């Protein structure tokens, strides 16, 4: 059974991203601008609508806002598919970086989008029933008890299991092979769960730590914990999220080329290490 070299994969991902950062920016900045602008206005409206609904008790008015959020998620997945296909091709050596801009949507982008959508659907298929059970266990409100805490841990367990097995190889598979991506990812990643988890941690944890640190520095000190009911604490959290939204959006825009470059190359490296058999052309 093939094994993914953890340290070498992480190292090569950082070397690739540092050496090709300008090209990565050229490949993704157009869809990244669209994602950032749409995300800012979508979340701004979402926070305002939820805050108003909690203050007035009229949660039924959140329908249009939730539909808008759903539309944003679909659009963001489409645009991320455009970005990842281009950068994965750069990591594979099948494309050169353009001088200043790129935007395309073809068969590979469509396959990447479907793979992202399928992964999201897979997560929701496990998470939604857990949330429904948790809500019923707490009577739809009140203070969460040990049962709810256990369900939250179960959700984290599902996420930790799914990401290395299904997501780690997804970008490379969607571009390099014409196969059902999630099924192929599950097959190839067998026996490499901890290695893939270590690679993902080595890529995302440092970047997200830096992003969180910059958010604290630029956004000022976090307010003291709010005493009172769960609703008051949630309201305070929403107000804080709304106030820091410009900073979060800006930081996300600037750090995205690094994260996409790191993840794309790590996915390609892991796929190359695990691909010990010829590509099978299976129509999804």
Language-model segments: residues:
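Nonpolar helix-loop interface/hinge motif
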Residues: 1-47, 155-227
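Alpha-helical transmembrane segments in multi-pass membrane proteins
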Residues: 37-81
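Low-complexity, intrinsically disordered extramembrane tails and loops of integral membrane proteins
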Residues: 1-3, 96, 100-101, 183, ...
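Alpha-helical transmembrane segments and their membrane-interface junctions
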Residues: 120-139, 204-222
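Interfacial transmembrane-helix boundary/kink motif in multi-pass membrane proteins
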Residues: 24, 96-121, 184
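Short, membrane-exposed interhelical loops at transmembrane-helix boundaries
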Residues: 58-60, 187, 226-248
């Amino acid at each position: 059974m093939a094994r993914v070299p953890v340290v070498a994969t992480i190292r090569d991902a950082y070397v690739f991203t540092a050496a090709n950062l300008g090209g990565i920016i050229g490949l993704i900045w157009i869809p990244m601008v669209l994602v950032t602008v749409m995300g800012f206005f979508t979340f701004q409206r979402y926070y305002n609508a939820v805050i108003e609904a909690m203050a007035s008790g009229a949660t039924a008015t959140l329908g249009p806002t939730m539909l808008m959020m759903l539309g944003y998620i679909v659009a963001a997945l489409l645009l991320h598919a455009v970005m990842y296909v281009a950068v994965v091709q750069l990591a594979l050596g099948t494309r050169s970086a353009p001088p200043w801009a790129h935007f395309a949507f073809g068969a590979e982008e469509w396959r990447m989008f479907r793979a992202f959508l399928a992964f999201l659907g897979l997560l929701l298929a496990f998470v939604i029933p857990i949330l429904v059970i948790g809500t019923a266990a707490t009577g739809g409100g009140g203070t969460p008890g040990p049962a709810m805490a256990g369900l939250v841990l179960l959700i984290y367990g599902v996420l930790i299991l799914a990401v290395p097995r299904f997501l780690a190889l997804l970008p490379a598979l969607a571009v390099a092979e014409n196969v059902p991506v999630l099924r192929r990812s599950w097959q190839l990643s067998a026996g490499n769960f901890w290695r893939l988890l270590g690679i993902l941690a080595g890529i995302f944890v440092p970047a997200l730590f830096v992003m969180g640190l910059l958010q604290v520095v630029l956004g000022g000190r976090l307010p003291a914990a709010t005493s009172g009911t769960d609703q008051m604490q949630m309201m305070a959290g929403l107000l804080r999220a709304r106030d820091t939204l410009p900073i979060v959006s800006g930081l996300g825009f600037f750090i995205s080329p690094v994260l996409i470059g790191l993840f794309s190359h790590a996915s390609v490296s892991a796929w190359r290490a695990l691909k010990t058999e010829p590509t099978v052309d299976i129509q999804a």
